[in-house]
Every structure is written in C-alpha cells, then in structure tokens.
Regions:
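Transmembrane-helix signature of 12-pass secondary carriers
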Residues: 1-194
C-alpha cells in the first residue's frame, strides 16, 4: 500500500489546477484516502474473521485496483474522492490483515523476518511511487492519470497471486474448526512442524 499512499504526491498540484479547487477542497480531496485508511484499519479485521484472511486480502487487492483505475479516470473531484476513499479502506484493512496472515502462515523460525518484510515492502512501494511519478511527469496533460493508474499493475498482480496462496491455518482452526486442512497447510509451509 506504500505506492497507493504516495503516488498522490505527483498529482496533487495538477488536480488543484485542473478542477480549480480552493485550498480547503484541495486538502480534503488529497486526504480522502487517509479517512478511508482509519476506517479500514478499525474494521478491516472483521471480514478477515468472517470470510478468511485470504479472501479478505483478495478483496483488498481489488479495492486497490478499482481505486487506482477509478481515480485515474475521474472527471471531477467528487468521483476522485470516492475512489481514493475506497483505496484508503484497502490500505487500512491491509495494514491489519496482511500482518495477521503473514504471522499465521509463516513458520515460527521465519515469522519475524516475514512480518518485517511487510513493512519493508511498504517502504519499497513508496520508493517505486516516487520513481514512477518522476518518469511519468511531463508525459502530457494526462500524466497525472498515468501516475494514479500505475498502481493498478501491482494491485492486479497481488490479486492474482493471492489466489494461489493457502488460507491461514489459524483461521481454519479458530473459525472453521477444520483441523485436517490446517494440518495440510502447515505441512506445506513448514516441513519441520510437528
């Protein structure tokens, strides 16, 4: 989600001029994703407990995908804010659900490193956003749309790849009482598990 949060830095001045926003509306529009982030973080764990970590992560990936494409295609500030808010919901939810999923599926000896890699990947996303903004800047009057749309690429990749990962064995045990499948998944991810 680092890329989704940071990419806005390359488009905010253009959007202010394009839609002739006053300072208050401009600030509100730029912060809309943050409002979604708070709500997503507060409530993102609920569907993870009901649907499963994997399904929730899939929907989070789709929210990033829809948000990036929708914001890139927005023709007014209101639709832009709706799509940025949706992306913010995904950011907030992912900040809760992804570390839970990683910690529940990772073998004990690698758990710390893998949970830390989540934060490292956020920072990597921030870097990629700044670099992509740099290279996309100046590509014409729609360069701001390209900057927002580029987030769709990792979002799509994530949404596809999550389909090939197993569900959290902890979720299967605690919420589905499925000991058999939980053991199968544990044997796949941790060959040294008892």
């Amino acid at each position: 989600f680092g890329m989704d949060m940071t990419v806005i830095s390359g488009v905010e001045k253009t959007i202010k001029e394009l839609w002739q926003l006053d300072d208050w509306t401009h600030g509100f529009a730029m912060a809309t994703a943050l409002y979604g982030t708070v709500i997503g973080a507060a409530f993102g764990g609920i569907p993870a407990d009901k649907l499963g970590r994997k399904k929730n992560l899939f929907w989070i990936g789709l929210s990033f995908l829809i948000s990036s494409i929708g914001a890139a295609l927005a023709n007014d500030v209101n639709s832009f804010m709706i799509f940025r808010f949706l992306g913010g919901l995904g950011i907030g939810a992912s900040s809760v659900v992804a570390p839970i999923y990683i910690s529940e599926i990772a073998p004990a000896k690698h758990r710390g490193k893998l949970v830390i890699s989540f934060q490292l990947n956020i920072v990597l996303g921030i870097l990629i956003a700044y670099v992509s903004n740099y290279f996309l800047n100046g590509l014409g009057e729609n360069d701001w749309r390209y900057m927002l749309a580029i987030v769709a690429l990792p979002s799509l990749l994530f949404s596809i790849l999550i389909l090939f990962t197993p569900e959290s064995p902890t979720f299967l045990l605690l919420h589905r009482n499925d000991l058999e499948n939980a053991k199968k998944i544990l044997s796949l991810v941790d060959t040294e598990a008892d």
